[in-house]
Amino acid sequence: MAKVRITQVRSTIKCPMRQKLTIKALKLGRINKSVELEFTPQIQGMVRQVHHLVTTENIA
């Protein structure tokens, strides 16, 4: 399974609670914090929900 690096680039202030909970589920919470996760369909859906708050990079 492919791995992906997800980095939070924008704050969750003034975001709906659902997006804040999604950021927390992705193990993020601070600007410029990064995590490396397996790119499963579940993670892909979470990233799609908060695409305006995060950036993604594929890891070989």
UniProtKB/Swiss-Prot annotation:
Gene3D superfamilies: Ribosomal protein L30, ferredoxin-like fold domain
GO molecular function list: structural constituent of ribosome
Keywords: Ribonucleoprotein, Ribosomal protein
GO cellular component term, pick one: cytosolic large ribosomal subunit
InterPro entries: Ribo_uL30_ferredoxin-like_sf (IPR036919), Ribosomal_uL30_bac-type (IPR005996), Ribosomal_uL30_ferredoxin-like (IPR016082)
Keyword Plastid carried by entry: no
GO BP annotations listed: translation
SUBUNIT field: Part of the 50S ribosomal subunit.
UniProt similarity note: Belongs to the universal ribosomal protein uL30 family.
Protein name (Swiss-Prot/TrEMBL): Large ribosomal subunit protein uL30
Species: Amoebophilus asiaticus (strain 5a2)
Classification lineage: Bacteria, Pseudomonadati, Bacteroidota, Cytophagia, Cytophagales
